[in-house]
Amino acid sequence: DDERLEILKNYHVTSIELGAQSMDDDVLKINRRGHTAKDVENASRLIKSYGFSLGLQMMTGLMGDTDEKCIKTAERLIALSPDTVRIYPTIVLENTPLADYLRDGSYRAETLNEAVSLCARLLLMFRENNIKVIRLGLHSGGNVDEGYLAGAYHPAFRELCEGKIYLEKMLSELSKLPKDMPYVIEVPEKSIGKAKGQNKRNEKALLNNGFQCKIKGNEFLNDYDIKITEDI
């Protein structure tokens, strides 16, 4: 409310993050989040009106959630023009209500591959709207490593998502080209490893799709941009 924001302003706070988690009221209710999508919208607008930097957090794989609902959540968060976003896939820890739901079959945890595919789409959506995703996936360590039971947890989750983006872009462009010749695929210099994929999985996927490619760096390309030429 206004009173609390005034206090934060007086203490020279510059940024505020809200744990929206979802913008679907049914999902919020099922997961007992204690707020509605309208609450997030109202709070976000009030925070921005005071000049604070606004950060929003969303989760994937919550009870009652779907990929379509997550995409809608991202669209509604984008409409609020946050400065930053964090995206966290849901994981299940031992000795939690979610662990009980998992065991009795009322909840199915999101798989790693499902989360990577979805979060790759979300990452591009926010980027296309000039919103920085400052965190994608949980940090490793602590209670997560000790109590992990199920869900999309990987210490290099963001790298997997970015690798997925590059693979889909490469396959999309290569599908327009003949398979009977080798190609050079240029990617941003800093993203060579992501484009090749962990354990070179993307290179293997290209080969499995009938394309012989070399992946090289180009310092003039922007994130997720690629350039394909014949390997003469």
Q: Residues of each region from the PLM?
A:
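Auxiliary Fe-S-binding modules of radical SAM enzymes
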Residues: 97, 104-232
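Conserved non-cysteine loop/helix-boundary elements of the Radical SAM core domain that shape
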Residues: 1-90, 94-113
